[in-house]
Amino acid sequence: MADPVLLHSRTVQQPRATINKLHILFHLTAILLLLYYRTTTLFYENNVPTLSWSLVTVSELFMAFIWFLGQGFRWLPISRSVFPEKSPSDVRLPGIDVFVCTADSKKEPTVEVMNTVISALALDYPPEKLSVYLSDDGGSFITLYAIKEAHEFAKSWIPFCRKYGIKTRCPEAYFSLLAEDERLLWSDLFKVEEENIKSKYEIFKKNVENVGAKDENNCPRMDRPPCVEILHDNREDEENKIPMLVYVSRERRPSYPHRFKAGALNALLRVSGIISNAPYLLVLDCDMYCNDPTSARQAMCFHLDPRMSRSLAFVQYPQIFYNVSKNDIYDSQARTTYTTKWQGMDGLRGPLLSGTGFYLKRNALFGSPNQEDKYLLHPEKNFGNSTKLIASLKSNHNIQDASIKDENSSVSILEDAKLLASCAYEANTNWGKEIGFSYECMLESTFTGYLLHCKGWTSVYLYPKRPCFMGCTTVDMKDAMVQLMKWSSELIKLGLSKFSPLTYGVSRMSILQSMCYGCFTLQPLLSVALLLYAIVPQLCLINGTALYPKVSSPWFGVFSVVFLSSLCQHLYEILSTGATFMTFWNEQRMWFIKSVSGSLFGCLDAIMKRIGIQKANLRLTNKAVDKEKLEKYEKGIFNFQGAAMFTVPLIILVILNLVCFFGGLRRVILENNIEVMFGQVFLSSFHLLLSYPILQGLIPSKRKRN
């Protein structure tokens, strides 16, 4: 039997992998020595400040534990390449259903959402095998109006992109500076057609913005029936085919749980199951447009590889943001995650599901590898009582041709689709439990991906040179902190639940993979350790109480090695990914600032939910662009407007460190004991350096008020 065509390659990152392992051994040795010093001094030395020493020791112990869990990311980092030119012919390619989710047209600009939809329609994939579904959880008039307008514009835009091989197929991005190179050196005919297309886009954009300007058209409807409309079903315009386009607004009733994004995705799973029933799904956030039309073909290089496709659940792409400033003062690009951690997990069982930009096997949501039919033994109990949905699950082929042959069958399918999008359909079924996206955690994609790995599925991570998906990130402290608080709260909830990676996960996946998940879920608790580390040594400094060895002591060298080793490892990862020292410093200070603010409030939020003081609610990040915020962000000025709650612990720590630093320094000079107190003087000064952006962000705003 001939060997299968090589569709992709896998390379271990060397010398990075070897350096990482050597550093783990070195750093672990230093940490063990440090903890040995702490514990022996506490139990065997006299005149030790027991409470302060114990608090600092516990902080260092927990930081060491989180560091140890994080080494799973560094054990086997790999890179992947794909060869889409070797992929099967269009006839043999499987179908793909694209899911785009939006919830609030006020916080998620409608034109931006439509650009994402249009870019998905324009993917370089056989149009008869591609279907795009928009989930509108707000049920607002403007979204339905806009998608109809987008459909009309797409009839001109998609043929134009195909004719000239346009790569940037999001119209807003194409007509901006992001795609300026694509518009050079073209013929006069191209320029004429481009101007015509641009004119149509401006008309489309203006129409949507004019309708959206009326508040009543933007108001989400929280009590409404389901609405499903097939805007394009591939039966017309054979010459310039465009993919199927479907609008879905699931039913909302105050008496039924909402289930947020997970509920929307499960509704799309059911509705698409009786309309197109593609074996693979692409899930996109409403602001994450398709930047490379070949992303689907690249993903199929893995899904169609017979050596791995049996157990492969999804292909994850990184989230790349087009509006990240040069300095990236808020660490919005999440460089560590997408250039270090995900590549490390890819060397194990694969990265976790990141919420957007992933190609997922539909059957993976319905069972374990080689046991996808398990839940079909009792289909009504698991999937509900829709005969069409159950039939689609049992079939191994795309049922689109059988579903929409004539107007009567189309009407019948729409009625069934509305039933599947109703609130009551999931009652007494396993949707959100063992079927579909999980309702256990509001980080629905992350938790669902975790469960997939626990069931035996694998995933891969692809970081191509040209970003396949691009989106808009937060440009002020408030939105960054609100987002972090939501993530931290849900991660802590997961880390301390019965599904904890260190208990539930470790028995179902490799130890290293469990360590990675454990690091993610427990990392928000670092906020407590860092808070203690930013308070206790400083108070002891001003009181003249030493918590660290003398500079002349060999044990001081151990503390220095741990500190410098950690910084050097971070700096090495920064430089090896092509970033600069400024990126290193920004990540250091934002790690501290976010930990003692957003993550800290996330922990408090999780506690309040646990004891019933606060209910779970969806906190949408505002994706509407504020020019003033954007200007400050691009200039590298921290903007704390609207983030008063998050700045309280930061300001308290800054004031405490200032008082303790200068008060302690005065005492050190008077008592001439710098050798004894140097560790705390240095620690306090380092905290002040990390906290400088807080003063930098607050002082200009005061000047502006004056």
Predicted regions and their residues:
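Glycosyltransferases that elongate glycans
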Residues: 1-459, 469-474, 481, 485-706
